[in-house]
From Swiss-Prot:
Region: Disordered, residue numbers: 720-744, 891-970, 995-1055, 1067-1119, 1205-1227
GO BP, one annotated term: regulation of Rab protein signal transduction
Signal peptide, first to last residue: none
Cellular-component GO terms for this entry: cytoplasmic vesicle; cytosol; Golgi apparatus; nucleoplasm
PPR repeats (start-end): 775-811, 812-846
Functional summary from the UniProt entry: Guanine nucleotide exchange factor (GEF) which may activate RAB10. Promotes the exchange of GDP to GTP, converting inactive GDP-bound Rab proteins into their active GTP-bound form.
The species this protein was found in: Homo sapiens (Human)
Name the UniProt record assigns to this protein: DENN domain-containing protein 4B
Gene name for this UniProt entry: DENND4B
Record domain uDENN: where: 195-369
PTM-bearing positions, type Phosphoserine: S953, S1092
Length: 1496
């Protein structure tokens, strides 16, 4: 799969302004409709001077000055009024353009403070008297005005003071809108009212024509289908309109103005824009006479005479549009383009730089965390990957919000947004508006603003201010030079840090906020505001390349830390505000009705309100009825695209404590590492065109202004090898359910894993929970491939209940979430309700994502039709029928007991007759005939424990005989044993026709327990016996006298463990079994039907001279075989191996062996599965485990071996025959294998009778990394997210992703969970299927594939010492699965094995350990066993007694006691050095949770 290219940083480049092509400008100017009362015309010139005159001293107002004689409300005022000796000062000001304007005023109390830098003190009047504004006398500090002037050459468009006024608060006057009030009182004396000076800053300019902006150019020309260029972009690029202005001829061009804006789509998606506004020359020829007169170009007295010394300029803008708010990068790029257009000449056109930036600069990603773009040798910009956070990405700047408004005003605006008021934010800096408005809508997270939102509103859209709905609008402050704001709008001036509101629409008091969370928020913001005042330096200057590569991250890191702390303070407040809201959610539990999506039906409003503080009820009453809260409850109930962010907020709610008066020590918004890689991608400027040899480089492109874009000069996308495709919408995984965890869930799971790693029990349960999570990740593919999808969903539901009964600790809710979404997808709302009830019973409160999937399944799925009364009556009828059946059950059981007693009596009589007949004709060829139904069955003693062929099958009944340790051929005991076995298995009466067999071996015996076969298959434990059953028992009874030897009575009491071990300690006396090749089947023999386990047992081919059940080397039987009994034994591979489905006894076409036992190369020791699990680290990126012997890390391996018995090139007919359940097996049935050690030897090719036509089995081996469930889950989630869940059902999965596949197969088989993975192995061997649907190999015949999990290694090391349990089997002459390839040390004799077993049987484990240590000798001179002492003794005991006869828990206790006893004499360190310690508690708990693999 090709790597997807990262998305573009910029999608469009546009040019906006007045229409070009030299056409005349329309006569009508563009004036927007007034949205408020009109103000008087603004002044044409700024204030350049301010003065103070003393009326009492006879001073007059200077020429050109204006005197302030009344307050803003029209009240007459006089400074120092009524005081003797007062000078009666009056403030005057003058307008003009002869000098730079004033930009700031101040009031200075002499002696108490020093003037601010850059300010001048107005200490004298124009007539050289004192300009003190305070009354004379002691106690009154001398008060002077101070001012600051704009710098020389600031230009025509420099901001300046445009108006002054005085206010009297005692008369009820407030600060006028858009004015800034000085905090110092101009009348500080005891007499007279307080007087404050206010001033207004703005742009004072005249002779301007305003028109609506138009689109002059764009690139690319074609719209992207997923992101078309909005038509309103030009008016946002020039929000105050495209203007034509008349300037003095020598006026310098002002610095370009940078602005940002946000366009919101109908679906709520945002498009970010950045524009650079600048002026350029405009030809006079395009102006009409009327327009020229309006601009002041023609004399108003002498008609038609042009005035000299004037220049005409027009405003234009260039802009970029993107889905990413990378405003600093956009500013640098647009500034570079503007400089490029006013300089030159250049060898490359401007269009080449535009297309190069759009196509070749991607948005930073984890693979490219830092991108350094070099636009020219002197212009560079650095792009860094945003901080990974669950919070939505936006263009908000909380630092600018806090710096512009301060802590108290910021909290006041938070209250206004929460109660959905009309907010109008204005400033003279257009780039500040977007950052602050974005912060306003971001600080109410998780609530989402639902009303109109325009961070930078153009004049053409100013009528939104009169809308009757709440809104957040940002606008340029010059708008208020013409209009007053509406009465019901709250205005916020970012330049003066003031809030203007009327009495009609007044905000709630901040005291209505929750008391303690409000105090914590205010204290936190105040502290950060002080830090911001000290460290914040504003936007960075033009950055050099050296700065970008060295100090940029340090500077940005400090800003990012403060940014996240301010955002975290608001987030904590919102978490405290909504604490406990999930308790009041109302889930849907029945078929939905009208109004099911109403907030009253989804949320208990009154209950939530009563749970809050009484002082805050007024706030909550308004908040609960807002549109954004209703939308929030709907998103929590039915899910949305913001589910990851909502889940993160829920985790924040759990962390906060509203009753505390200090914030939590752990920050809610953490700064994460951007990437572990320090990779910086360097993007060079576009290449200059190649020149012919010998020619000189001549610049070709020179611009007088920003040129008109020419399509032929853009570099086409095909010419760029690294070009990025046009971005489309983000593609989700193809799978319908989304089983992916959110980033917050991954963090929580990581923390849980780290805590669980310190507690052994929790670590094992943590791994088990992740294993179940793996299965549910694969559940969508399993359900799609199932014949009955509804049944598959119910299977998953039973797995959930099994997890609950097993007290499995789940790290997240993915298991429940996947099942609920599948219920929604396949229309199973009732099952979804049952899953929700299971969650509640397990004490799990569903998070936002799970809760949304649940309600969606209940709301959108079709509920079953029918009335509840009908279902209730059917249920009652069902109960009546079941009750009647239960009453008849005792009668049926009594009849069966009587029939069994009669049959036993008849069997005993028949056995005696058969025994006499067999004694006289044991050497003759048997003749099989159909027995009568009452023919007695003979008994054979064997172990009927768990099936060695099917680890998933439950253990069957254990059938034992009496004490038969020295009995050889005990006839009555054998007969009684077979009868007891048949009674335990519930075998029916024999039926069928006699079939002559000619073979000297008996078939395999495999018991599946008491689980019935689905579908009533005749292959189960309750199937009927064939006609040959009794004849086979006759053959067994005839061999009894010939075997000879001692006989014990059948009624001898059973021996204990010590007696059984003593009985088993003579295995080496038997001679090796001779193998007799069986004759081939007659060609005319019809294929036999499927048989039960007892059918296979009772089918003789050729009567051997003695009984075929060998027990001295058995893991489960209790009697020995004589030498003669082994001499005629012919071992062949069973053709009726158990597969995944009980009752299937067909030879598997493909056998898979898996083992996780791995070798530590550091100490040459084998580490077993539970030890590997205990050594894993709680890290989803660490593949290593820790060796329990040398503590060295290493990567464990999962060994895989596949044995394929199918033909090499199967034809369609043969392929179908090989998979048929009734296909005959060449060679007939195999021998009776009542011994587990004999079962382990069936993988030898020479012992197989299940191969086709004698062909050898194809064996393929491999080893892959054995992954922790944490690591495997991360890799599987990545695979599903990138390729969809369909990849888990493709036959290419084993070859394309072998590590993931084999690890999944190992865990699923280990936990006995159904899956389609075994079928994928079979399909991958056949190759992809092109002519048929994948269902045949997704649900293969269970007999086709068999998976066996082994505890020990698959292939032994020939250079190492053999394990003791293998030596026991070698001494016992029992064929192995793999013949030991190396020599056997003489010290590891049979006597040693017998001694070890004897000590174990006598509860003297310490002696067994000491004996082994003494025999091996001290390292490094002694023998080196790859397995530890604990493992050697355990495996030897299990090989001698059988796995089901060994209580591993009791063995661990005994071994621990023996270790402590030896440690007192030898020391624990010495025992550990010689690898005699037992597994750690963590390893033992892992084995307890997962269970030991059934085979060695």
């Amino acid at each position: 799969m090709a790597e997807e290219r990262p998305p573009r940083l910029v999608d469009y480049f546009v040019v906006a302004g007045l229409a070009g092509n030299g056409a005349p400008i329309p006569e009508e100017t563009w004036v927007p409709e007034p949205s408020g009362p009109l103000r008087p015309p603004r002044p044409a010139e700024p204030i350049t001077d301010v003065a103070v005159i003393a009326r009492a001293l006879g001073e007059e107002v200077p020429q050109g000055y204006t005197c302030i004689q009344a307050s803003a409300g029209g009240h007459p005022l006089e400074l120092s009024a009524g005081l003797l000796g007062g000078t009666q000062p009056v403030i005057c000001y003058r307008r003009g353009r002869d000098k730079p304007p004033l930009v700031e005023l101040g009031v200075l109390y002499e002696g108490k403070e020093r003037p601010k830098p850059g300010f001048q003190v107005l200490d004298t009047t124009p007539y050289s008297h004192s300009a003190n504004l305070a009354p004379p006398g002691p106690g009154h500090p001398r008060t002077y005005l101070t001012y600051r002037r704009a710098a020389e050459g600031a230009g025509l468009h420099a901001l300046g003071i445009t108006d002054l006024c005085l206010v009297l608060p005692s008369k009820g006057e407030g600060t006028p809108h858009t004015y800034c009030r000085l905090p110092r009182n101009l009348n500080p004396g005891m007499w007279g009212p307080a007087v404050y000076l206010c001033y207004k800053v703005g742009l004072a300019k005249a002779n301007t024509l305003v028109y609506e902006a138009e689109l002059l150019g764009r690139y690319p020309e074609e719209d992207n289908e997923a992101f078309p260029l909005p038509e309103s972009v030009p008016v946002f690029c020039l929000p105050m309109g495209a203007t034509i202005e008349c300037w003095p001829a020598q006026t310098k061009y002002p610095v370009p103005v940078f602005s940002t804006f946000v366009l919101t789509g109908a679906a709520g998606d945002k498009v970010y824009g950045a524009a650079l506004q600048f002026y350029e020359a405009f030809p006079r020829a395009r102006l009409s006479e009327r327009q020229a007169r309006a601009l002041g170009l023609l004399s108003a007295v002498e008609r038609g005479r042009a005035l000299g010394g004037r220049a005409v300029r027009s405003r234009r803008a260039i802009a970029v549009l993107s889905r990413w708010p990378a405003f600093p990068a956009f500013r640098a790029f647009l500034t570079f383009l503007y400089r490029y257009s006013v300089s030159g000449p250049h060898r490359l056109p401007l269009e080449a730089h535009i297309s190069h930036f759009i196509h070749n600069v991607p948005f930073p990603s984890p693979q490219r965390p830092r991108i350094l773009v070099q636009m020219s040798p002197y212009d560079n910009l650095l792009l860094c990957q945003p901080v990974s956070s669950p919070l939505p990405l936006s263009g908000a700047s909380f630092l600018q919000l806090l710096q512009s408004l301060g802590p108290e005003l910021a909290i006041t605006l938070l209250l206004a947004v929460l109660t959905e008021h009309k907010l109008l934010v204005h400033s003279l800096r257009p780039d500040l508006l977007t950052s602050v408005c974005e912060a306003l809508v971001s600080m109410i997270f998780p609530l989402h603003w639902q009303c109109p939102y325009i961070p930078l509103c153009p004049l053409v859209l100013a009528d939104v201010l009169s809308a009757p709905v709440p809104f957040i609008v940002g606008i340029h402050s010059s708008y208020f030079d013409l209009h007053d704001p509406p009465a019901d709008v709250i205005c916020v001036d970012l330049d003066t840090n003031t809030l203007f509101q009327t009495e009609e629409k007044k905000l709630l008091s901040p005291r209505t906020l929750p008391r303690r969370p409000y105090k914590v928020l205010l204290a936190t913001l105040t502290n950060l505001y002080q830090q911001l005042d000290q460290t914040y330096t504003g936007p960075e200057e033009e950055a050099s390349l050296e700065f970008l590569l060295t100090d940029y991250e340090a500077v940005c890191g400090r800003r990012a830390r403060l940014e996240r702390e301010v955002q975290g303070a608001f987030l904590r407040f919102m978490a405290c505000l909504l604490k406990g809201y999930r308790v009041f959610l109302r889930p849907l539990t029945q078929a939905p009705s009208e109004g099911a999506r109403d907030v009253d039906n989804l949320f208990f409003l009154q209950g939530f309100l009563k749970s809050r503080e009484r002082s805050s009820h007024k706030l909550y009453s308004q908040l609960l009825h807002t549109q954004m809260f209703s939308q929030f409850i709907e998103e929590c109930s039915f899910g949305s695209a913001r589910h990851a962010a909502l889940e993160f907020f829920d985790s924040c709610v759990e962390k906060v404590h509203p009753e505390q008066e200090k914030p939590e020590p752990t920050p809610l918004v953490e700064l994460e590492e951007l990437s572990g890689s320090e990779l910086t991608v360097f993007i060079t400027p576009p290449e200059e065109p190649a020149l012919p040899e010998g020619s000189e480089s001549t610049p070709q492109y020179c611009y007088d202004g920003f040129p008109e874009l020419r399509a032929e000069l853009f570099e086409s996308l095909q010419e760029q090898p690294g070009a990025l495709p046009v971005p489309g919408p983000s593609r989700s995984a193809p799978s319908s359910p989304a089983p992916r965890r959110t980033k917050q869930e991954m963090k929580v799971a990581q923390r849980m894993a780290q805590k669980s790693a310190a507690v052994p029990e929790l670590w094992a349960r943590c791994l088990l929970g992740h294993c179940y999570g793996l299965w549910f990740l694969c559940l969508p593919a399993y359900v799609r491939s199932a014949p009955s999808r509804v049944q598959a969903l119910h299977t998953a539901y039973h797995v959930l209940r099994q997890m609950e009964s097993g007290k499995v600790v789940l790290p997240d809710e993915v298991c429940y979430r996947v099942l609920m979404q599948l219920c929604s997808h396949y229309g199973q709302p009732v099952l979804s309700v049952r899953v929700m009830l299971e969650m509640r019973q397990a004490g799990i409160v569903p998070n936002t994502i799970t809760y949304g999937y649940y309600n969606k399944a209940v709301l959108e799925s079709k509920w079953p039709s029918g009335t509840p009364g009908g279902r209730l009556r059917w249920a009652k009828l069902r109960n009546v029928v079941l009750g009647a059946a239960q009453f008849r059950q005792p009668l049926r059981e009594r009849q069966q007991q009587q029939q069994q007693q009669q049959q036993q009596q008849q069997q005993q009589q028949q056995e005696q007759v058969s025994a006499h007949q067999e004694a006289g004709s044991s050497q003759a060829e048997p003749y099989l005939e159909r027995p009568s139904p009452t023919r007695p069955l003979q008994r054979q003693t064997t172990w009927a424990g768990r099936s060695l062929r099917d680890p998933a099958s439950p253990p069957g009944r254990l059938v034992k005989s009496g004490s038969l340790g020295s009995a050889r051929g005990a006839q009555p005991t054998v007969e009684a044993g077979v009868a007891h076995m048949i009674e335990a298995l519930g075998v029916l009466e024999p039926r069928g026709s006699p079939v002559p067999w000619h073979d000297g071996s008996l078939s395999d015996l495999s018991l599946t327990g008491e689980e019935p076969l689905p579908g009533g298959s005749p292959g189960g434990s309750g199937s009927a016996l064939s006609a040959q059953s009794t004849e086979a028992l006759e053959g067994l009874s005839g061999r009894g006298p010939k075997a000879g030897g001692r006989q014990d009575e059948a009624g001898t009491p059973r021996r204990g463990l010590g007696a059984r071990l003593q009985q088993l300690l003579t295995p080496s006396r038997h001679s090796p079994a001779s193998r007799i090749p069986p004759p081939e089947l007659p060609p005319d023999l019809p294929p036999p039907a499927r048989r039960s386990p007892m059918d296979s047992l009772l089918h003789p081919r050729e009567r051997p001279g003695s009984t075929a059940s060998e027990s001295s080397a058995s893991l489960g039987s209790e009697w020995d075989l004589s030498e003669s009994s082994l001499s005629n034994l012919s071992l062949r591979r069973s053709s009726e191996r158990l597969s995944d489905t009980p009752g299937s006894f067909q030879s598997p076409s493909l056998e898979i062996l898996l083992s996780s036992c791995s070798l530590c190369r550091a100490c040459d020791s084998l580490v077993y599965d539970e030890e590997i699990m205990a050594g894993w680290a709680p890290d989803d990126s660490n593949l290593n485990t820790t060796c329990p012997f040398c503590a060295c890390p290493f990567v464990p391996l999962l060994s895989v071996q596949t044995l394929d018995s199918r033909p090499s090139v199967p034809s369609p007919k043969s392929a179908g025959a090989s998979g048929s359940k009734d296909a005959p097996v060449p060679g007939g049935p195999g021998p009776v294998l009542s011994d587990r050690r004999l079962c382990l030897a069936l993988d030898e090719p020479q012992l197989c009778n299940g191969h086709m036509g004698g062909a050898s089995r194809r064996v393929e081996s491999g080893a892959w990394a054995y992954l922790s469930p944490l690591v495997l889950r991360k890799e599987l989630e990545s695979l599903v997210e990138n390729e969809g869940s369909e990849v888990l059902a493709l036959p290419e999965l084993p070859s394309a992703h072998p590590i993931i596949f084999w690890n999944l197969l190992w865990y699923f088989q280990r936990l006995r969970l159904p899956s389609i993975l075994p079928g994928l192995v079979l399909a991958s061997c056949d190759g992809p299927s092109h002519s048929q649907a994948p269902s045949p190999w997704l649900t293969p015949d269970p007999a086709s594939v068999q998976v066996r999990l082994l505890w020990d290694v698959l292939t032994p090391d020939p250079n190492s010492c053999p394990p003791l349990y293998v030596l026991w089997r070698v001494h016992s002459q029992i064929p192995q699965r793999v013949v030991w390839p190396g020599p056997v040390p003489a010290s590891l004799s049979l006597a040693l094995l017998e001694s070890v077993l004897r000590h174990v049987g006598l509860n003297e484990v310490h002696k067994a350990v000491g004996l082994l240590l003494e025999t091996l000798g001290p390292p490094p001179t002694g023998l080196h066993l790859q397995r530890g002492i604990y493992r050697e003794i355990l495996f030897l005991t299990m090989a001698a007694l059988g796995k089901d006869h060994v209580d591993i828990v009791a063995f661990d206790k005994k071994y621990k006691s023996a270790f402590n006893k030896l440690a007192s004499s030898m020391g624990k360190e010495e025992l550990r050095h010689r690898r005699a310690q037992m597994p750690t508690p963590k390893a033992i708990d892992c084995r307890k949770c997962f269970g030991a693999p059934p085979e060695c």
